[in-house]
Regions:
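Switch/connector loops and helix/strand junctions flanking conserved nucleotide-binding motifs
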Residues: 47-48, 94-95, 170-175, 196-199
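A short, basic N-terminal segment
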Residues: 1-35, 53, 57-82
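Sensor-1/coupling segment of RecA-like P-loop NTPase cores
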Residues: 154-178, 188-191
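C-terminal alpha-helical "lid" subdomain
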Residues: 2-14, 25, 48, 81-82, ...
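Mid-core helix/loop region of P-loop NTP-binding domains shared across ATPases and GTPases
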Residues: 78, 89-154, 161, 193-204, ...
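Hydrophobic anchor at the beta1->P-loop junction of P-loop NTPases
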Residues: 39
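Short glycine-/polar-rich loops that comprise or flank the Walker A/P-loop
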Residues: 34, 79-83, 158-160, 181-186
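Walker A (P-loop) phosphate-binding loop of P-loop NTPases
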Residues: 44
Length: 248
């Protein structure tokens, strides 16, 4: 389990699941072939967390310039980072979404070029936006028609892999925009945790939170059965339930 600090989450350590493994393969394919991919799933199944863990994106990179020396901390961040993560704002015009994307792709490119010890500052500035291999847009359901056109234009211009994350049905909405839909190469449905997988990972989660699960104790087994039944594989519900357990 790897540390992934996200405000508001009780489960600070990321637990690799089968669904994350499938998401990783899907995202890597979008990078390798420079396609647009759609990731859809019910609320709370872990789409956003999977995207954050896959990219290892850190907002500290935003604002990085070509002049100042790259700090050791940011060099470690960019070495582990596989792309930019953008959460579509509730109010999004083409200008807003363009700014949100380019700020991050530029920061990624500048940081990567400096980490690779590129001596030519002009080259760093001019080529920075083209160095980002992947852009993931979370809450893509919020994007307006014009904002989607802007995203498509940036995708064509900079040739990064693109993943759009949203709710079930987002693919039907995109199908109404032929210019965007024709560029979609992959689709992935992010599903809930299976019951078997929940029973496998829960003891690990408990251990990480400083709790002990003993399968020989009836009360522990009964507690596990109750959690499985109540949460039904929804990661957000699992996180909330464990936050209540810790509080008590």
């Amino acid at each position: 389990m790897n540390e992934l600090h996200m405000p508001g989450r009780t489960l600070r350590s990321f637990v690799p699941t089968q669904e994350f493994g499938k998401f990783r393969e899907f995202a890597n394919s979008c990078v390798d072939f420079r396609y647009i991919g759609i990731c859809l799933g019910e609320p709370g199944v872990g789409k956003s967390l999977a995207a954050a863990h896959f990219t290892q994106w850190c907002e500290e990179l935003v604002g990085e310039n070509a002049i100042d020396e790259l700090s050791a901390k940011k060099e470690r961040i960019i070495r582990n980072c596989s792309g930019a993560l953008v959460t579509a704002p509730v109010t999004n015009t083409p200008k807003i979404i363009r700014t949100e994307i380019l700020r991050r792709t530029h920061a990624y490119g500048v940081a990567l070029a400096k980490a690779n010890r590129e001596p030519d500052v002009c080259k760093v500035v001019l080529e920075a936006k083209g160095l980002c291999p992947l852009v993931i847009i979370d809450e893509a359901d919020r994007l307006t028609i014009n904002a989607l056109e802007e995203v498509r234009s940036l995708y064509d211009q900079y040739q990064f892999g693109l993943v759009l994350i949203g709710m079930p049905g987002i693919e039907k909405r995109f199908a109404r925009y032929p210019q965007l839909y024709s560029r979609i190469g992959f689709s992935h449905e992010f599903k809930r945790l299976s019951e078997d997988e929940m029973r496998f990972i829960f003891p690990k989660i408990w251990s990480n939170l400083g709790l002990t699960y003993n399968p020989d104790y009836f009360s522990d087994v009964e507690a596990l059965n109750t959690i499985v039944r109540i949460t039904a594989g929804n990661f957000r519900l699992i996180d909330r339930l464990f936050s209540q357990i810790i509080r008590n």
